[in-house]
């Protein structure tokens, strides 16, 4: 009996040993399979990394200088001469060079219609002496945001809207259209009076030139000129506003900006950011005629029966800022005011060394304070400004003014 038990014990022990051995072998096979799959995956990742890195290099190279196509071809030949690299890229189709070249050309076309600026490590806030609640300073050459204060927060642009009005109009008329005539209707004047808009002063049924409408829209911020210009271009203000919103889309601003009128009247759906307005001004400055209109200090409309000597109009911002040293020159500007926006303005300044800056501010406490915010910001970021040239005491007293401009 004892020997039988001993034999059974040995058999059980052998059985358990074989099971343990089989389990260990199974685990070893699983581990080996895992290592093989891991090794295979790492090789694939390595090849893919080389592949993607190579393609990225080609794209970066092509976008940096898409005109140097021969250099790209030389790069292709160099890669092909290295079998260990080429073998790692069995799926590379070097037609990607042609595609990259085409995409680079498309990018160049895009640059003609879209503008941008980005923040970097040097982007600053604004000093306490800047009163405006909202603001942004853009370096046009470097495409950087030098300073911002809620620069991408939605605001009511008020009459800064008219920068877009003249830009869209300029892009939708013939080159010889400036001498065309347009008759200002009683309905247009009634719209201006009923909405409390600023006006050039055109009378009912007064016939003026299209050029008068451009200058009248910007210099005195004339709603009569703006609506007349919109009607001349598109047949109605409503149709013209559609063109304005299409232009926002072209500029890449349609997600944060939308317009409902060409004048700048407050509406819940009429909005943009300081950044958006800076990009709109940048596009306008790039248009030769818009730049001319925005930089004109004084203008006299053509003679009409109602105004034989024309109407003398002026750019209020430029005239007030022209004797304030900033280390450069404020070349273009447009102000705005509605209750919801406070005093706001968009301006462009340059110096003789090629520095090009745009400043947009919103919600200042007065028209003079608004201007001095721009002057203060230009003085900080224009490299050539000499503080000894500023009369701080006189400017502080002047800034106490509290008039409003639409």
Name each model feature, range by range.
Residues 1, 9-13, 38, 68, ...:
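Short amphipathic alpha-helical segments that mediate assembly, nucleic-acid/protein binding
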Residues 30-34, 64, 74:
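Compositionally biased, charge-rich terminal segments
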Residues 47-63:
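Hydrophobic membrane-insertion alpha-helices, especially the h-region
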Residues 15, 89-275, 284-285:
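Active-site-adjacent loops and short helices of periplasmic peptidoglycan-processing enzymes
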Residues 66-96, 110-134, 236-405:
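Penicillin-recognizing serine hydrolase domain
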Residues 1-35:
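N-terminal targeting leaders characterized by basic, low-complexity, disordered sequences
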Residues 30-46:
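Short, Lys/Arg-rich cytosolic juxtamembrane segment immediately N-terminal
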């Amino acid at each position: 009996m004892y020997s039988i038990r001993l034999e059974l014990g040995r058999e059980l022990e052998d059985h358990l040993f074989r099971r343990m051995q089989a389990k260990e072998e199974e685990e070893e096979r699983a581990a080996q399979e895992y290592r093989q799959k891991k090794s295979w995956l790492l090789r694939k990742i390595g090849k893919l990394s080389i592949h993607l890195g190579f393609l990225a290099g080609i794209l970066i190279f092509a976008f940096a200088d898409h005109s140097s196509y021969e250099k790209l071809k030389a790069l292709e030949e160099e890669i092909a001469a290295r079998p260990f690299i080429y073998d790692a890229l069995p799926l590379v189709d070097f037609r990607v060079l042609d595609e990259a070249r085409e995409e680079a050309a498309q990018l160049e076309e895009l640059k003609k219609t879209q503008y941008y600026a980005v923040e970097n490590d040097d982007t600053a806030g604004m000093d306490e002496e800047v009163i405006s609640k909202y603001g942004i300073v853009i370096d046009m050459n470097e495409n950087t945001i030098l300073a911002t204060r809620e620069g991408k927060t939605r605001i009511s642009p008020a009459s800064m809207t008219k920068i877009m009005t003249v830009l869209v109009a300029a892009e939708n008329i013939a080159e010889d259209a400036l001498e065309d005539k347009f008759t200002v209707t009683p309905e247009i004047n009634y719209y201006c009076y009923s909405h409390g808009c600023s006006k050039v002063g055109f009378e009912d049924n007064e016939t003026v030139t299209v050029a008068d409408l451009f200058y009248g829209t910007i210099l005195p911020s004339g709603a009569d000129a703006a609506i007349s210009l919109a009607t001349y271009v598109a047949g109605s203000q409503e149709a013209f506003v559609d063109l304005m919103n299409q232009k926002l889309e072209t500029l890449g601003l349609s997600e944060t900006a939308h317009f409902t009128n060409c004048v700048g009247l407050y509406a819940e759906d009429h909005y943009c950011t300081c950044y958006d307005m800076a990009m709109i001004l940048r596009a306008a400055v790039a248009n030769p005629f818009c730049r001319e209109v925005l930089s004109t200090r004084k203008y006299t409309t053509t003679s009409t029966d109602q105004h034989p000597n024309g109407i003398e109009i002026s750019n209020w911002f430029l005239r007030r800022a022209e004797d304030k040293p900033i280390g450069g020159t404020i070349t273009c500007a447009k102000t705005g005011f509605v209750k919801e926006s406070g005093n706001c303005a968009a301006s462009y300044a340059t110096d003789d060394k090629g520095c090009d800056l745009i400043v947009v501010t919103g919600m200042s406490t007065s028209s003079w304070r608004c201007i001095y915010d721009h002057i203060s910001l230009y003085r900080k970021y224009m490299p050539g400004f000499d503080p000894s040239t500023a009369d701080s005491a006189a400017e502080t007293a002047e800034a106490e003014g509290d008039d409003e401009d639409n």
